[in-house]
Amino acid sequence: FLALEADLTANMGADLSAGGPNASTNAASTAMGGVYNIPHVFMTSKGVFTNTTPVDAYRGAGKPEANFIIERLIDIAAAKFNFDPVELRLKNIISTLPHNTAFGLQIDCGKFKENIERACNYIDYEGFLKRRETSRTKGSLRGIGFGCFLETSRGFPVEGAEIRFSESGRIELRVGTESNGQGHETTYIDLVSKSLGLEADLFDYIQADTFKVRLGSGHGGARSMHMGAATMMIAVEEVINKAMG
């Protein structure tokens, strides 16, 4: 691929929300082009008012739309020029890391090519044409679709986490993100307990307690696992280093 030009018209609804404009501009730009090496990307976005419910950030907020654009374009190009859609993706996938996108973001890790190849092996992609022809003789249509998703976290780039051991044998996991139904208390404890080789029921989960949690930037922007879990793993490394040292 040489370049991508995206001209977006985003439905803001009948009123302007706090996150609606950001979802179709800044958030979308972080994923525009997906996991493909596209040296030049130009994007414009125009918000329009309609007689519908106001749009605001929910899950992903702009990244699904950006990924859909490039993935759909690849399928259209493959059909028009008689390319295999998987081969076209593999030919243009990001292969050298770290990779700087056209918008200046750095992608430092990712197994993009390997993920596509594993998916192909898992579904027996080579045998798809035969399965499709068999279905056709029975009066059925069989289709197949591929899509890669590049996710970027938003929100403040600062996070905190602490692991504290008490004389009683209990362990406090203090986190700066906050769960309001997503199940952080289960996911985080599972991650930390397995990393330390300890039983999960030894942990007490602490959030939203300003007497105990010294630093945190909350949830939102798909940042809790990106930022919160990464910070916890740094704390895990500190615990192990102290225990070994």
Regions found by a protein language model. Name each.
Residues F81-R89, G197-D201:
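Helix N-cap / loop-to-helix initiation motif
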